């Protein structure tokens, strides 16, 4: 088979039911596209106690620098109610100019287009003056423990070094050419437990209601704002995601209350400085006796998620300029350079080389009837092909 057709590539990948953690044949299908192009393809299985084993793929064309890495994932989220789809989620049907299927935009479409772009570049110009690699995981939509982070470590231990990376996540809100991601906010999650004294609701003086205290502590995290934003990032934002007491009785004051929160933060902070700020706010609120006159300060515990992510911003001018000019050349749109949205595997790649993200329009990702315009697949392939040419030209300067 030839890999120059992004539509055929994507149909092949979608027909592999690779719902995390299942490989579903998707990495094998990708390998079949890359091997005829001259890539050396390797598979790596990552394991960790308490998590499913995950298959990953690393493929490289060339042995010299400069070295461009394309990164992404072939795993997809569950389809939900398959009967609600207008086309079977793994059939890759085309209707009304759109290709339907789970993973169409997130992100088998990006992989299909980059494979086609590389194939076209080789067909027209031969292999690039350097190296291109695919770093593809099967664990991005899941825990992300046995995926990109371990694949990077494995490859680096074998001597792999990269000069730049492009992640093919769907970055465009409305149309191709809208947005390139040049960084990501950091993320911290925490869990607060307030300890009270259980008692009868009619005799509050004999109890200590932790609900009042947990509300006060969470309010201290919400106001005042952590910052007003920076030149490249929107304001840091904390959301309380749950408050629980585990109490079904209306006449019982509970013994404890718990809350969870997540904060997406900008480059005003690091994980360490932000945790210190959160603790300072909680300590001040716990010591405030407004709601608990004459009592000891509120007793609380806090634990942190063991996998926070640091904020990062890519400042590699050659990488950003090569991609921006390629997008503008093909679409006529000047893309916005953005750091909005959630986290991605770029947070791991940033520790090895400069990284940017650009892919399809993300409006239907994770939804019933996930789909992509067939025309967008051709356009994205043209963007990627132009980017490859320009990046290697700029990297040689």
From Swiss-Prot:
Family listed: Belongs to the peptidase M20A family. DapE subfamily.
Positions of the catalytic residues: 75, 140 (proton acceptor)
Annotated keywords: Amino-acid biosynthesis, Cobalt, Diaminopimelate biosynthesis, Hydrolase, Lysine biosynthesis, Metal-binding, Zinc
Cofactor(s) of this protein: Zn(2+); Co(2+)
HAMAP family: DapE
Record EC number: 3.5.1.18
UniProt binding sites for Zn(2+) 2: 106, 141, 366
Record's protein name: Succinyl-diaminopimelate desuccinylase
Function of the molecule: Catalyzes the hydrolysis of N-succinyl-L,L-diaminopimelic acid (SDAP), forming succinate and LL-2,6-diaminopimelate (DAP), an intermediate involved in the bacterial biosynthesis of lysine and meso-diaminopimelic acid, an essential component of bacterial cell walls.
NCBIfam families referenced in this protein's UniProt entry, alphabetically: dapE_proteo, PRK13009.1
Cofactor: binding comment: Binds 2 Zn(2+) or Co(2+) ions per subunit.
Quaternary assembly: Homodimer.
Originating organism: Rhizobium rhizogenes (strain K84 / ATCC BAA-868) (Agrobacterium radiobacter)
Pathway participation: Amino-acid biosynthesis; L-lysine biosynthesis via DAP pathway; LL-2,6-diaminopimelate from (S)-tetrahydrodipicolinate (succinylase route): step 3/3
Gene Ontology MF annotations: acetylornithine deacetylase activity; cobalt ion binding; succinyl-diaminopimelate desuccinylase activity; zinc ion binding
Matching PROSITE patterns: ARGE_DAPE_CPG2_1, ARGE_DAPE_CPG2_2
